[in-house]
Design a protein with these regions (language model features):
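Active-site lid/adjacent beta-loop-alpha segment flanking the redox-cofactor pocket in flavoenzymes
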Residues: 289-327
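Dinucleotide-binding Rossmann-like beta1-alpha1 core, especially the glycine-rich loop
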Residues: 50-160
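Glycine-rich FAD pyrophosphate-binding loop
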Residues: 28-47
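N-terminal Rossmann-like FAD-binding beta1-loop-alpha1 element of flavoenzymes
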Residues: 8-34
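Central helical "cap/lid" subdomain
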Residues: 231-296, 305-308
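Helix-loop-beta segment of a Rossmann-like dinucleotide-binding subdomain
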Residues: 85-98, 139-142, 149-153, 157-203, ...
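Helical element adjacent to the flavin cofactor pocket in flavoenzyme catalytic cores
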Residues: 170-242, 246-251, 255
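Conserved Rossmann-like nucleotide-cofactor binding loop
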Residues: 18, 41, 250
């Protein structure tokens, strides 16, 4: 039981995006927070690159889930404005795909209205640009015109971002219109560095890096959590009023320590990095080639990085690392 006027002690296991964000949020409120991370730095788990501001990469999910993703993405950008890579995403449907661009447009219109309503509620929600510019469609005639334009070193509008797409995809094997949407990139390295700097500046937050939590017990006498952890080859023990399991895809290990196992699904998506000669100074948007999930024609994702590097990945059985559900 927490004594009256005594500050509650919170333990967070896992310093990934969720754990670091929770520690930062509670720390800014002045709560007593201790964050345990087994690696040498925060946000060092599986890489990410995309802000799903509307969930347009996932046709399989519902409209309600897409709206939820839009709202969560806006909240995330407001909390971490410094981690955005401001580049749009282009959505392409191959001729072989069973879907149509028109089906996507219905959802995009819904998301545009939802975004407009969120801006009306709070002007600070306008983090994806103007609502009327949330997405733009391009017919083939427009793409053919852009194909003849010179590349722009620093694109400032949708048309300039679309030029390298028009020049490099096979226009005879895709459906029109092509769609550009304001789903931005996320910079993993800025997030890791920024959260570390902010957390280190908070007196109410204690960071235990390179610390492995190996046991957690419930003290029924005072209703506290006893966390045992290894740091610098020594075992330590601390007592907390609240415990947050933020261990990411290793969440099940902490569940087992608590004696409270639960079912979970972990999906791993393979990714590869390649360098494209001659594209060092070309600013590409992200490009999504839709496909049927889990088939040889699964979605392909083309994510640009500086100096002509690109991350390539897709949802097919051949490159998905694990097929079975994992604990």
């Amino acid at each position: 039981m927490i004594e009256k006027n005594k500050k509650a002690k919170i333990a967070i296991v896992g310093g990934g995006v969720a754990g670091a964000s929770a520690a930062l949020y509670f720390g800014q409120l002045g709560l007593d927070v201790t964050l345990f991370e087994k690696e040498t730095s925060l946000v060092s788990g599986p890489p990410f690159c995309h802000l799903h501001a509307g969930g347009n990469l996932y046709r399989e999910i519902s409209d309600t889930q897409c709206v939820t993703l839009l709202k969560q993405s806006i909240d995330f950008l407001r909390f971490y404005p410094f981690i955005v890579d401001y580049r749009p995403t282009v959505i392409v449907l191959p001729l072989s795909d069973s879907g149509t661009p028109e089906a996507l447009l219905l959802r995009l219109d819904l998301l545009t209205r939802e975004y407009e309503a969120l801006i009306a509620q709070d002007a600070d929600n306008k983090v994806l640009g103007e609502s009327e510019n949330y997405y733009k469609r391009y017919d083939r005639s427009e793409i053919e015109v852009l194909k003849q334009q010179e590349l722009v070193k620093t694109p400032k509008n949708c048309d300039e971002w679309m030029i390298p797409v028009a020049k490099n995809i096979d226009l005879n094997n895709v459906q029109f219109p092509l769609i550009m949407v304001q789903e931005y990139g996320l910079n993993l390295f800025r997030l890791a560095a920024g959260t570390a700097l902010m957390l280190e500046s908070l007196e109410s937050v204690t960071l235990h890096m390179e610390s492995i939590v190996h046991n957690i017990q419930k003290n029924c006498t005072n209703d506290a959590w006893i966390v045992s952890y290894l740091k610098e080859d020594k075992s330590h023990e601390e007592s907390f009023d609240y415990l947050i399991n933020a261990a990411g895809f290793r969440t099940g290990k902490i569940d087992d320590l608590l004696g409270a196992p639960c079912k979970a699904m972990v999906e791993f998506k393979a990714a590869y990095v390649s360098q494209w000669d001659g594209c060092d100074d070309t600013c590409f948007p992200e490009i999504i080639f839709h496909g049927e999930r889990g088939t040889p024609q699964g979605m392909g994702q083309f994510t640009p990085y500086p100096n002509g590097f690109f991350q390539l990945h897709g949802m097919t059985k051949e490159i998905t690392l694990y097929v079975q559900i994992l604990r």
